[in-house]
Amino acid sequence: MSAKKVLFITQDVPESNLALIGQNLPQAIQDKGREIRTFMPKWGIVNERRNQLHEVIRLSGMNLIIDDTDHPLIIKVASIQAARRQVYFIDNDDYFQHRQMTCDENGKEYEDNGERAIFYARGVLETVKKLRWCPDVIHCHGWMSAM
């Protein structure tokens, strides 16, 4: 019997309790012998150099239409060597780059949070289709990752 495939979609980076669960749960799932793919937005606070992110050209290059506007979908990946796991990052300059997660530095929510969530969800689904990978279970962790 083949290993169950789990798609783990999270919104946070390790700065909160929710993010710590989002970091540890995929590892526990993998340690149980499941095949897992983890996705998260490439927030502006994620350091590409320190985390050794690189663009996956074969997965990038598509545009997603949100509210009648084309937005380029950029896919980046980082390997967690000690965990033998990869994390895919959904990136877009308008929605994620140079921004905090859901609120600005003054605590005010971004007006386009709904659009950002739609872009993220569609970006994950389109990327999984391009990977030709069909999960048995989809786990959405946090409201931004809700499908």
Specify the residue positions occupied by each region the protein language model found.
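Nucleotide-activated donor-dependent transferases that construct or modify glycoconjugates
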Residues: 2-15, 40-42
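Structural motif
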Residues: 5, 136-137
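A short, glycine/small-residue-rich beta-strand->loop->alpha-helix junction that serves as a flexible
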Residues: 11-21, 47-49
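A short, Lys/Arg-enriched amphipathic alpha-helix followed by its capping loop at the start of a domain
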Residues: 24-34
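Hydrophobic anchor at the start of a short beta-strand
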Residues: 34-36, 87, 135
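Short His-centered aromatic/hydrophobic patch
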Residues: 141-144
